[in-house]
Structures are given as structure tokens and as C-alpha cells.
Amino acid sequence: LLQALAIVRKRYPDVKLYVGRKDYGRIPPLARNAYERYIHRLLRESDLYDHVVFTGSLNAQQMKERYLKSQVFVLPSSIENSPNSLGEAMLLGVPCIASDVGGVRCLMTHGAEGLIYPADDPHLLAYDICEMFAHPEKAAQMARAGREHAGKTHDAQKNLEILHQIYTEIAR
């Protein structure tokens, strides 16, 4: 995502990425683990510190507010199964871009409810982000379709009934 952000910034110099995590730059260098050092180096080398906002831990209401203020939600995972964050963003009607991993295609149809890109392709991710920014009406259309789809796949009562049916069949 940071590699894609460096590309997006060339076209949208005011772009901001909000990350629900502690600020890597505020961690003393000797206290950083390998991943934190890697992220800090990427931020520094790409001159992205002014474009990334680390929100720290957020409660449910703060998360909802952050989602709703976002022009696009990006799930850049390299490993996922059924990502809750993608479902949350879709339920809130936020335009979504997700890496093509795990169960993402079960939650979202590429081009209809959001955009799906190869997890190892920051250039395509950057392109997709720029497309969402450049075509807000298309992004809003996908977000509406995503919200409708997520409303079906994340219906707690319906999912409980399906689970009950499965266990009833197993118990027979």
C-alpha cells in the first residue's frame, strides 16, 4: 500500500492514508521490531510521512467515523480469509479496493461491488485508487452495490439460521 501511495501522490499530492496503528516514527529506533523498521524505512525513503496518519487504536464509533470520512477503503493484505474490515467498509457504503487473497472474491465482485487487484502489484493498486478518485460517481455506484451485497452476506439473523441448519444436518 505504501508503494502504491508513493505513485498515487504524484497525481494527487494531497492524498492521505489513515492507518489504525501506532506511529512507527514515534517508536524509538532500538525498540522497533523488523516490520516496524521496514515500514519506517519505506515511509522515509518514499517521503510519505506527511501523507500517512497513524490513528492509534480506535473504538467502534471512531472506526465508523473514519470509514465514513474515507473516499476509498483499501484492504492490502497478502493473507486473508474472510476480512471483517472489508465487510465493515462495504456495509457502511465506502468504495472498496481489496487484494485478491483468501475469501475476498466471496465478499466482493470485481468491477461491480469494488475493485480487486493482485496482492503483489502496487502499480495496479495505485491505478485502482486513482480510478476511484477520478470517477467518484462510478466509485459511489460500486459502493452502493457493495453495501447491498454486504447487507445480505453479513445479516446476523440469516447467518445464524444457516449455521443452525448446518449443525442440525450434522447432528442427524
PLM features per residue range, with description:
Residues 57, 65-70:
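Short alpha-helical donor nucleotide-sugar binding micro-motif in glycosyltransferases
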Residues 110-111, 115-122, 131-136:
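Conserved acidic donor-binding segment of nucleotide-sugar-dependent glycosyltransferases
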Residues 95-98, 108:
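Short hydrophobic beta-strand element within catalytic cores of glycosyltransferases
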Residues 124, 131, 138-153, 159-165:
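A short, well-ordered alpha-helix in the C-terminal region of glycosyltransferases
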Residues 16-37:
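Glycosyltransferase donor-sugar binding loop
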Residues 78:
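Aromatic "clamp/platform" in nucleotide-sugar-dependent glycosyltransferases that forms part
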Residues 31-58:
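Nucleotide-activated donor-binding/catalytic signature segment of Leloir-type glycosyltransferases, i.e.
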Residues 73-74:
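A short hydrophobic beta-strand element within the catalytic core of glycosyltransferases
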